[in-house]
């Protein structure tokens, strides 16, 4: 991701704010084409949200996030969201999975431990 892309940074900050207001999360990662500097005009933001509560349904959380993201006014880069609880995400990070790649190479947009 180009650090001087002001529009991208503003959009990602707005996405992060919407997500943190929607769900009690541990971490939010950006991954995919914007991290790898392979984005094109039609690229979307790939966002992975790690939630605290194991009892919450990740699919229900995703739906709430999408609903709140859809309320943004004006033109925006599309957002693709994945949600998983902290324990499962951390376990998947020990295996050769997408989650491990995200934890190692993704851009950490939010970490509850750093914002406290």
Where are these regions (language model features)?
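Catalytic core of pol beta-like nucleotidyltransferases
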Residues: 1-27, 35-41, 51-116
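Short beta-strand->loop micro-motif that forms the acidic, two-metal-ion catalytic signature
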Residues: 46-50
């Amino acid at each position: 991701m180009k650090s001087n892309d002001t529009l991208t940074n503003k959009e990602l900050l707005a996405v992060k704010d919407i997500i943190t207001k929607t769900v009690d999360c541990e971490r939010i990662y950006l991954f995919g084409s914007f991290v790898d500097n392979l984005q094109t005009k039609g690229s979307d933001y790939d966002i992975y949200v790690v939630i605290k509560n194991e009892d919450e349904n990740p699919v229900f959380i995703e739906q709430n996030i999408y609903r709140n993201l859809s309320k943004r006014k004006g033109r925006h880069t599309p957002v693709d969201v994945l949600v998983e609880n902290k324990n499962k995400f951390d376990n998947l990070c020990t295996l050769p999975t997408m989650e491990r790649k995200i934890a190692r190479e993704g851009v950490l947009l939010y970490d509850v431990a750093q914002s406290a």
